[in-house]
Curated annotation (Swiss-Prot):
Organism name: Salmonella choleraesuis (strain SC-B67)
Cofactor dependence: pyridoxal 5'-phosphate
EC number: 2.6.1.9
Keyword check for Membrane: no
Matching InterPro entries: Aminotrans_II_pyridoxalP_BS, Aminotransferase_I/II_large, HisP_aminotrans, PyrdxlP-dep_Trfase, PyrdxlP-dep_Trfase_major, PyrdxlP-dep_Trfase_small
Protein's GO biological process: L-histidine biosynthetic process
The protein's assembly and partners: Homodimer.
Sample GO molecular function, one term: pyridoxal phosphate binding
Name this protein carries in UniProt: Histidinol-phosphate aminotransferase
Gene3D superfamilies for the chain: Aspartate Aminotransferase, domain 1, Type I PLP-dependent aspartate aminotransferase-like (Major domain)
Family that this chain belongs to: Belongs to the class-II pyridoxal-phosphate-dependent aminotransferase family. Histidinol-phosphate aminotransferase subfamily.
Signal peptide: none
């Protein structure tokens, strides 16, 4: 048998996958901490009891109770809701449904969430970046100049990792610019912390608007992996063609439906109030800490701050078991670390450790 043309397993893989740098999630980056403030999770667990025991049967593709509860919560029709394995799957579904590999492009505005880029690269779709302006708002002219061949524009509001809302007038301008040309995906993963800013009321006006949501943040269910896509029925029907036949396991659907009950939503709002209170405490303390140069405004459950020696600070806290998120490699975020709002005890540990840093 000839071995001249034998390929290794790696050689058999697609070239773009061989070259792909995977998304560096908080868990993938690791660490041996006991204060985890790097993934924007809620700091304490919420307990649920499973009520569905029919694990011998396949689940519904789109569990009725989950869809109806979320539609009622979000103020949309059930036909405008799709549930998936986290909002990350929603990102991937949008690219798979709307972009031809090798022909179409997605566009996003760094510094922002990393999965838009990774999902496009995995699928083999061109990635276009239009860096945000100095105040991290949209460069509308830059976006307009790059719309030819762009099928999906991703905008994160509030933006991760910077924490600010995108100017609503700019979002309207973007939706007018893209009408009949591209889909605009508004990632509202953190919208529960500023619900007045949601774009759900705009879905009637803009058939090309899509909104991503999650249970990972304010609902305190990051381990559940449950997200939502809100859009007009025409878009949802296209996504239903490409989603897996059983995206949610029965236990996930069971817990999600409970979390979206009236009691579950009230509990979520209590958590938001608690988080906002702790965020203010953390902001005030950071502003009075010598190694902190600047604390940026936040509408979320995390704070971005610029430090005098951020790499040293990051490593020092890491060595003490306090795990933050280093943002130095993101465009325009030199010297910045992102800190999830934790419990009062966790927040105090961060402040105490930072105040012990040499300046």
């Amino acid at each position: 048998m000839s071995t001249e043309n034998t390929l290794s397993v790696a050689d058999l893989a697609r070239e773009n996958v061989r070259n792909l740098v995977p998304y560096q999630s908080a868990r993938r980056l690791g660490g041996n901490g006991d204060v985890w403030l790097n993934a924007n999770e809620f700091p304490t667990a919420v307990e649920f009891q499973l009520t569905q025991q029919t694990l011998n049967r396949y689940p519904e593709c789109q569990p009725k109770a989950v869809i109806e509860n979320y539609a009622q919560y979000a103020g949309v029709k059930p036909e405008q809701v799709l549930v998936s394995r986290g909002a990350d799957e929603g990102i991937e579904l949008m690219i798979r449904a709307f972009c031809e590999p090798g022909k179409d492009a997605i566009l996003y505005c760094p510094p922002t969430y990393g999965m838009y880029s990774v999902s496009a690269e995995t699928i083999g779709v061109e990635r276009r970046t239009v860096p945000a302006l100095e105040n991290w708002q949209l460069d509308l002219q830059g976006i307009s100049d790059n719309l030819d061949g762009t099928k999906v524009v991703f905008v994160c509001s509030p933006n991760n990792p910077t924490g600010q809302l995108i100017n609503p007038q700019d979002l309207r301008t973007l939706l007018e610019l893209t009408r009949g040309k591209a889909i605009v995906v508004a990632d509202e993963a953190y919208i529960e912390f500023c619900p007045q800013a949601t774009l759900t009321g705009w879905l009637v006006e803009y058939p090309h608007l899509v909104i991503l949501r999650t249970l990972s943040k304010a609902f305190a269910l990051a381990g559940l992996r449950c997200g939502f896509t809100l859009a007009n029925e025409e878009v949802i029907n296209l996504l239903l063609k490409v989603i897996a036949p059983y995206p949610l396991s029965t236990p996930v659907a069971d817990i999600a439906a409970q979390a979206l009950s009236p009691q579950g939503i009230n509990a979520m709002r209590d958590r938001v109030a608690q988080t906002v209170q702790e965020r203010q405490y953390l902001v005030n303390a950071l502003q009075q800490t010598a190694c902190v140069e600047h604390v940026f405004d936040s509408e979320t459950n995390y704070i971005l701050a610029r430090f005098t020696a951020s790499s040293n600070v990051f490593k020092s806290l890491w060595d003490q078991g306090i795990i933050l998120r280093d943002q130095n490699k993101q465009p325009s975020l030199s010297g910045c670390l992102r800190i999830t709002v934790g419990t009062r005890q966790e927040n105090q540990r961060v402040i105490d450790a930072l105040r012990a840093e040499p300046v």
